[in-house]
Amino acid sequence: MQIDISTQLPCSLAEVIAQVRTPRLLHQVASPLLSFSPLTPVEFPGTWSEGTYWVKLKLFGVLPIGRQAIVITYPQMENAQTFMLRDNGYSPLITKWDHVITAQEVSGGTLYRDRVTIEAGILTPFVWLFARQFYAHRQRRWAALAANGFSY
């Protein structure tokens, strides 16, 4: 199942790129619905490099819901005014969590888009329902952070 949601952010493409590359931003936009704790490597880097990061997930910061692989790549874009980050993640229960973030410079700011493909067997509809709410929450948090100059 797929999710495709976008929002226009009141900031430059360069600001979005700088922020989306940081685990710190992930914590900000996911909170308080999900929290991520690094397993392997044992600490998050200052910025995401291409590679696999295993994390422990907690719902509302307290309820353990398992572990997840965050698999970061930065696909090349033909258009210099568009940025892409891909997390082709998975977990023991979710066989596919393919999250593609694109950011594109538009008049008045940056168009930010989350596209997610989820496969989790018979759990897929339930995981999709949660993910739909989660990504809407993330985009609201993104918009609030961008409006405040990313001071967090």
How would you name each of these model-derived features?
Residues 1-49:
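Hydrophobic ligand-binding cavity/cleft-lining segments
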Residues 2-4, 65-71, 95-100:
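Short, surface-exposed coil-to-beta transition loops
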Residues 8-12, 56-60, 104-106, 117-119:
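Solvent-exposed residues in well-ordered beta-strands and their adjoining turns
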Residues 16-20, 26, 85, 103, ...:
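Hydrophobic pocket/interface hotspot
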Residues 38-88:
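Glycine-rich portal/gate segments that line the openings of hydrophobic small-molecule binding cavities
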Residues 82-132:
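Beta-strand/loop substructures that line and gate deep hydrophobic ligand-binding cavities in soluble
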Residues 133-141:
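A non-catalytic, amphipathic alpha-helix used as a structural packing/dimerization or gating element
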Residues 140-152:
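Charged phosphate-binding loop/patch that engages nucleotide di/tri-phosphates or the phosphate backbone
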